[in-house]
Amino acid sequence: MTKILIIEDEEPIRRVLVRILIDENKNFQLTEADNGKEGMSFLKKEKFDLVLCDIKMPKMDGIEVLQKTKINNINIPFIMLTGHGNLETAVEAMKLGAYDFISKPPDLNRLLTAVRNALENKSLRTENNK
């Protein structure tokens, strides 16, 4: 079972992401967090295969979540989401190790392609490390 953490403060966007992912694959096990602090708490307790993370959130933003995962040696692909398609923020997220960067509301095909590619890339890296 593939475990995906969705960190998104806007509940309507979170619902859309959940629906898209469940429609794509019924075997996805989804966990939801409504801010970066809650998301970081999940990341410290559980293993996930992928994280979808908003950038602008209360309590802890997505960039800070990325920084903390790096500090804590949590090696999970992140797909960053933002309602403000800012190139500087995208570059910063990628420098911190984000796998991809998607504007909100997410385009269905773009999101699913990014999810599939991130999971496939993670699977290949895991195979190569055996």
For each of these PLM feature ranges, what is it?
Residues 11-31, 45:
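Two-component/phosphorelay signaling modules centered on CheY-like receiver
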Residues 18, 32-41, 62:
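Helix N-cap/capping motif at the beta->alpha junctions
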Residues 22, 41, 63-75, 92:
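Short amphipathic alpha-helix used as the core "switch/output" element in two-component signaling
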Residues 46-52:
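Active-site beta3 strand of CheY-like receiver
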Residues 54, 82:
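Active-site residues of response regulator receiver
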Residues 57:
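Receiver (REC) domain active-site loop signature in two-component systems and cognate sites
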Residues 104:
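A Lys-centered signature of the CheY-like receiver
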